[in-house]
Every structure is written in C-alpha cells, then in structure tokens.
Amino acid sequence: MAMGPPPEDGTVAVVVRVRPPTPSERDGAAHPVLHVVDQHILVFDPEEPGGPPGAALPPRGPKHRGKDLKFVFDRVFGEGATQEEVFQHTTREVLDGVLNGYNCSVFAYGATGAGKTYTMLGSEQSPGIMYLTMAELYRRIEARRDEKSCEVLVSYQEVYNEQIHDLLEPKGPLAIREDPEKGVVVQGLSFHQPKSAEQLLEMLANGNKNRTQHPTDANATSSRSHAVFQIYVKQQDRVVGLSQDLQVAKMSLIDLAGSERASVTNTKGERLREGANINRSLLALINVINALADAKSKKTHIPYRDSKLTRLLKDSIGGNCRTIMIAAVSPSSLAYEDTYNTLKYANRAKEIKLSLKSNVLSLDCHISKYATICEQLKTEVADLQAKLRAYEDAARDAGKQIPALLPPPRMEEAVPESCSAPNVCRESDGEQQELGAGQDAQLGGEEEVLEEMPPSSPSPTQQTDLQLGMKKPNRLPQRLSRSHTEMLMATILSVAQKQYSLLKAANLLTPDMVSEFEELQLLVQKEAAVSPQPTDTSGAPPALRTQRGCDASPSTLSAEPSVPTTRAALRRLQQLTALSSPKLVAKKRRRSEMSNTSRLETPHSLNTRAKRQRKSSPLSAGGEVEAQRSPHTPCLKEPQSPPLLPCCTPKICPLTVTKRRAPLMTSAAQNCCTPTVCDLNVTYSLSEDVAKPGALSLPRFPGWENAPCALKKQEGPFVPRASIPVFSMKGSSIPKPSSISKGSVQKRRGAVSNASRSLGGIQSHITSSSSRRSAQPQSIPEHPPPGLTWKGRSGPR
C-alpha cells in the first residue's frame, strides 16, 4: 500500500547552457545572437551584437522572428561554465529527492551540435553529469549505510529509428509494455547491480561504445539515437519488523538526439532516415510538453503513444517526477532558427505542473516469515550485545592498565598517610566536629549551618590532616627521594582519589567506576599490609620513638635538614602542639561525666547518644581507647588506624565549613536556663507536715501558671542556675488531691532530695546535649526522669 506525505506541487526546472563558439564559427566572423545578462536572464538577438568592433554583420533573413527578446530561466550558464558548476545546480539538488523516494529525470534538449552529449557524458578530462551524479549518489548511500540498506539497479537503453535497444547487453529490438503496477516496462531489458561507483561508470562507458553515432556536416560526433540511463534506488530500514516501509525511486538521465535540417546536414540514405525519425520523436515530445503545459486547455489526452520516446518517458516528464530540462544552445548566428526554437520550447516547459509524491510502500510480512524475522532480530540483538560487551571490556582493561604499569613493591611508602577511601576522609570530618561539640555547647546554643566551601579555601578537615601530617615531617620526603617511581605512584594515586571525589560529588559515578576504585583501594591496602616497615637508625624501641616524636618541639623538627618546611607549616605545627592535648582531655572528661549520669538519662537521650556513637568514626574510637589505656601519659601514642593524607599530597574530600549563627529566639529549653528563684521554689515546694495528706491542691503550685509567662519575657536574658533544674509536667498527668496518700508524699520528698544530690550531673548532661535536641520552649516530655517519678495513680501518658 502506498504511503507517504501529501503530494507537493511544483514545476519543471529549466536551465540554459550556452556553448562556446567553435573554431569555424570564429573564422566565419559570425556574430553571437545570445547575450547572457546574469544568472537568470538571457537576451536573444540583441540590438548591439557582441562581435568585434568593425566586423561586418551578415544580413538578416526573412525568417528572423524578432529582435532583443528576453528569456528568464531558473539558471543560465554562460560560455565559461564548467561541468562541475552545471552539476551543482542541476542533478545534485535532485539527489536528495531520489533518496527520499521521489522520481527524478534530467534530460538535455537542443539542436545538433549544441553540446547535449558533452553536458551529459563529458570526456575523460571533464566528466559530465552522469559521471558526477553516480559518484555523488554512492557517496550519499555510503553515508547512510548504518541506517538503511540500499540497493541500486541500472539500465541503459537507446531509441534508434523508433526501436529500443539494450546498450549494456546488445541484442535485437525490445518491445515496450505498460504494467498497471510497474508502469512502462521494456520487455527483456537487462538490469545490473553495481557494487561501487567505479563499476557503474565502467558500465556506462561500455554502453556508450555501443551507442549509434555517425558524423554529419553539422556535427562530427553526431548521436543518431536517444539514450536513456535509468537508476533504480530501493531503500529499506535495517531494523527488522513485521511491517516494513520500502522506498523505491527512479532517476532517468536522458541524452536526446539533436534536431537537424536535411539542407544543413546534407544527409542522404540511411542518415536521412535517421534524421527523420529523430525529428518525429522530438516533435511528439514537443506536443507532450505543450499538452502538459497548457493548464487552461480542456483536453485531457496527452499524446504519449505517438512515439516510442514519449512512451518511454511517460513517467519521467511531469506528474509524479521532479524534472529538470537542460536546454543547450549555440551562440552563433548560423544556428539562429535552432536556437530560437530551443529557447521557445524551453520557456514553454516552465509551465508544466508537477505533483510530487514519495514512493513509500508498506510491506506486511506473511505469518510464515515471522520465525525468520524473529531469528534476524535475535541475531541483531546478539551482535549489539557483543559490541557492547567488547566496549565495556576495553574500557575496563584501559582502567586496569594504570595500576598494572606501577611497580607493586613499597606501595605504602609512596603514600604513607593517604586516605584509603573517601569514607575515611568523611570520618575524619566527623571526628573534628565531635571534638568541638563540647565547646560549641557553651556558646549560648548557637546553631550550626553547613554550606559548601569553594575549592580555593582549605576546609577544616584539610587543616586537621595537615596538622596530623606534620607530626612526622621527616618521613615522606625521605621515602619519596628514594625513587622517582614512588613519587609518580603517589601523584597518580592522589589524582585517582581526586577524580573519585569529584565524580561522586557530581553524582556521575557508575558501578564499573566504583568497582575499579575499590580494586585500586584493595590493592593499596594489600601492598601496605605486605610491605615491611621501614627501619629506624636510632635503635630505640617503637614506644620510645613514638614518645620522642610526641615530645619533640617545633624548633627541633624544623632544625632537621632533611625536612623541607615552610612558615605556614611551622605555625600549624605550633597550633597542633598547643591545642591537640586539651581537646582530647576535655573529650575524655566529658565522656566520663556522661558515663556517671547514665542512670539519669531518659530513653530519648539514650537514642540520641546511640545515634551519635554510630556517627563517630573509627579513628575517634581508636583515639578514645588509647586515651583510656594510658590516662597518665603526657603525650598520646599514635593510634593504629589507616594512614592520613600528608601535607604535600592534595586532599580531596567533600568541602564543607561550619558557620555559626545566633538562634532567632532564646528559650529556657535551648539555653538550659531557669526562671527566677522564687518561681522555682514555689513550683517544687512540698508540704512539710506529713500528717496532712490532703493539703495538696492545684492552687498551691503558682509556678505552673507563671512558667509560660516567664519563658516569654524578653527584657533580659535568663541567668543559668546550676543548682536548681526546671521540671514541668502536663496538666493531664497531675494527680488529684484525693489520690495522694501520706506514703506517696514521703516517697516524693525522698525522690526530690535524691535528685538534688545529682543536680551537677544532670546540669552537665543537659549542657552537653542541649545543642543536639530540638525541644520547643513549652514542650513537656511524656516520660519524667526515673529519679522523679510519681507513684500511685496518674493521668494518661
């Protein structure tokens, strides 16, 4: 079934080519009768001839049609136009239509000796339109070979004395038939399928040798027949399916024989009969052109059957075919009549209307071919999977070539303090934030805000690693100076780590890349475990060497000649020696206080602490264990943890910086502050007389009503009192006066006295965990502390 876009309207494109004058025309002093004004306008028989000045003009005969006639065409080529220029503006433009399923035809029309055969065939030095068109067609087919499969069939025939002959396989005259589906068909015509443009051009050259030519007085190489070279292009999508679209287009390149006058050519006998048949077929072609161009005429009959030539070109002129007519004319006044007639019919052909439609056929496959189609699809899928697998293997092998080229021994010496993975870098960031958590809680409940830091400024993690790397300044330079290869290894590994961090930050990591980086990490850790530890020339035991390294002063470290240090490094080293020990001791003290008050923690605080412990890094845990083992040691020993990045190696981790800002509103729950003393005393005052169990009532507790008012006051900041905590309770949980017994009052008084003994622990616990709780100013916990629980009946919890 024919499918495709709606028909497109158009007209026949007409171009005119003026050939250069021949030597005989120059010697005869014949003035030109054509003047090319520009690329579209041509003047016939101008008033001022373009001949040499002073040349005698031949007298005008009585048959001269007019003077100074102007013709407008789609393109006008002067005497100096080349074959390539004519091709660019004629058949090159219609090749796109052929590849899109449109029929196209290009034919040269004109008198004998006007240059039709030269324009279509050319010579070896200057090939014509047929040669250039075939070369360009195969070039475009090769460009779209991956998308569509193309098949090219060619045929070459001639019409000689109203008989059709095969030029590629010469044989007798062939009959012409009309098929309702295929159109005009020449019975017995051979079709050939060239594999390349060179093979096709060879076929074209052999066909021209079989073409009938004979010299006449008008033309030494006069063609005595009409040659028709047809190219069939069949295209199909490479994707196999149950229904496929098939595009079939036909392109006809026609070299017509020239009309001739018997009085001019002086032909007799066989040549005279040939000329008569040529003129008869051209007359039939002119009638067809007139009928197609006369749109106002009521005649619907087109005289295609008047000649074998017109029957053969029935589907190549007008209708569903993009047609280009090349009118070849002579500028000499000797061919005045022939030039005028050619221009007149060429101007007439411009009025032929076209209705272009793409020849797309939808082929539905029979059910018997479904199995074959499925096999083809499976084969195509297997081929694509094999190509994809080969591509992935090549990419994986290329990634493995980098560690394979590096020498495996002494891997840990090349990167003694580099992070084994980006997770270690992030864990060091968590340790740095946890060490400063105790100091942050004392700044008035400031809020921590994390935002990205530009790569140019160093992050706190980088500064910490830089200070830790300066503890052993004489280790890395000595090892890197041993071999240039080890330095190259360290550089490559740092670049790989940087690439991993950047890709992960941009969310561009693929599973293959992650596996490659993990293999590289495992290789580094494996080599670090296998490689022997470097020997120390001092001869001291390891503990003593560690003690000496910790007790060394910055001046002692900078005095060693083998360590290249800078002023910034010395300043950071001084900061390290001044600030590293207090942070660790404060952390140990804080953790010991938290362990003492573990019995007073609520379930919510236990969950918060469990989450905080899970966030802590292995490095910090290792440091705490070492500190607990040797609490009286003046300097902490080096923890057995993965090595950190040295100061000379670029550290690539998620760059974040911690900024602080004051909260929008201060509250007692956030700042661990208490209301005034009088409110607190009244709130928790209990009856002194044990013998009066019924004296407890709601009006005896004015602090419950004044607490919200005290929290809303903004005249002055709340003064933290470390001696008395604040406890509040929901109204629904207040026991009724009748439900309180004498024993419950005594137990409550004992619980309050026990709670007052551990107020210091509670206050320290509240201070350390206030920054991590998001409690509202008026929120009341559902579960009271275990030291102040109400016994007896209470409201719903």
Swiss-Prot record:
Residues 412-476, 528-564, 579-640, 730-797 are annotated as: Disordered. It holds the Pfam family Kinesin. Residues 594-608 have a biased composition (Polar residues). GO terms for molecular function: ATP binding; ATP hydrolysis activity; microtubule binding; plus-end-directed microtubule motor activity. Residues 11-352 form the Kinesin motor domain. GO terms for cellular component: cytoplasm; kinesin complex; mitotic spindle astral microtubule; mitotic spindle midzone; nucleus. It comes from Gallus gallus. It is found in: Nucleus; Cytoplasm; Cytoplasm, Cytoskeleton. One of its GO terms (biological process) is mitotic sister chromatid segregation. The keyword rRNA-binding does not apply. Keywords: ATP-binding, Cell cycle, Cell division, Coiled coil, Cytoplasm, Cytoskeleton, Microtubule, Mitosis, Motor protein, Nucleotide-binding, Nucleus. ATP binds at residues 110-117. Belongs to the TRAFAC class myosin-kinesin ATPase superfamily. Kinesin family. The gene is KIF18B. The keyword Transport does not apply. Residues 731-744 have a biased composition (Low complexity). Residues 367-402 form a coiled coil. This is Kinesin-like protein KIF18B. Its main location: nucleus. May play an important role in microtubule plus-end depolymerizing activity in mitotic cells.
